[in-house]
Curated annotation (Swiss-Prot):
The gene is gloB. Pathway: Secondary metabolite metabolism; methylglyoxal degradation; (R)-lactate from methylglyoxal: step 2/2. The keyword rRNA-binding does not apply. It catalyses: an S-(2-hydroxyacyl)glutathione + H2O = a 2-hydroxy carboxylate + glutathione + H(+). It comes from Cereibacter sphaeroides (strain ATCC 17023 / DSM 158 / JCM 6121 / CCUG 31486 / LMG 2827 / NBRC 12203 / NCIMB 8253 / ATH 2.4.1.). Belongs to the metallo-beta-lactamase superfamily. Glyoxalase II family. This is Hydroxyacylglutathione hydrolase.
Length: 255
């Protein structure tokens, strides 16, 4: 049975994600920007939280962990490589490790770039991937700690997941990301359509997260740095893919 997903808006533009196994009644949350909205969502559904999964150490993803742990008794799991700067962990995770939510099994994917210890969680039976600030709707996270080469390889790992995978990223950044993408390829029909769809969703107050991986592969410039058309668009026809990615990231940082 696929996991039930609840997207919980937090802070000004963050998301936390509740995942619930109806068969066993077990519930986990991915990232805790703040505890209040998550506790409210749990109470509204009568769910009990047993596990907190963390993608990376930034405060807007972990600030509510201690309050939520105290209120629910949930255990906390995060990257072993970042254990020294995450809230105290009950379970330290690395590439290929498995986490469970009820009967569902998720695999840990190390995705350095935004931070050096960033991880993602892929639940194949539910077609869900929780990517934090690595792969995002129409974008990717800034390179605060890692290199462009590291982030490019991380994005390649995520883009190799099944195309039907829903990408649950940590922020509502799609509108700005889409406007930036349109500056690179203003005449792309697929991009024009997606920019319009995102704008319409935001106008109606609907989240753009999660997004389909297939849509990201088709329109997200940070996944397309190896494509000839995008290399031509940025004037880097003969450059290595990671170099093109780095240039796109540099332009986005200044956008």
């Amino acid at each position: 049975m696929p996991l039930e997903l609840v997207t919980v808006p937090c802070l000004s533009d963050n998301y936390a994600f509740l995942v619930h196994d109806a068969g066993t009644g077990e519930t986990s949350v991915v990232d805790v920007p703040e505890a209040g909205p998550i506790l409210k969502a749990l109470e509204e559904r009568g769910w009990h939280l047993s596990q907190i999964l963390l993608t990376h150490h930034h405060s807007d993803h972990v600030a509510g962990v201690e309050e939520l742990r105290a209120a629910t008794g949930a255990r906390v799991a995060g990257a072993a490589a970042d254990a020294h700067r995450l809230p105290p962990l009950d379970l330290e995770l690395a590439e290929g490790d498995l986490v469970r939510v009820g009967a569902s099994e998720g695999r840990v994917i190390e995705v350095p770039g935004h931070t050096v210890g960033h991880i993602a969680f892929h639940f194949p039976d539910s077609s869900l991937a929780f990517t934090g600030d690595s792969l995002m709707a129409m974008g990717c996270g800034r390179l605060f700690e890692g290199t462009a080469e590291a982030m490019w390889q991380s994005l390649r790992k995520l883009s190799a997941l099944p195309p039907e995978t829903m990408i649950c990223s940590g922020h509502e950044y799609a509108a700005s990301n889409a406007r930036f993408a349109a500056t690179l390829e203003p005449d792309s029909p697929m991009l024009i359509f997606r920019v319009g769809s995102i704008a319409a969703a935001r106008k109606e107050g609907r989240p753009t997260v999660p997004s389909h991986l297939s849509d990201e592969i088709a329109t997200n410039p940070f996944l397309r740095a190896g494509e000839a058309s995008l290399k031509a668009a940025v004037g880097m026809v003969d450059a290595e893919d990671a170099e093109v990615f780095a240039e796109i990231r540099r332009r986005k940082d200044k956008f």
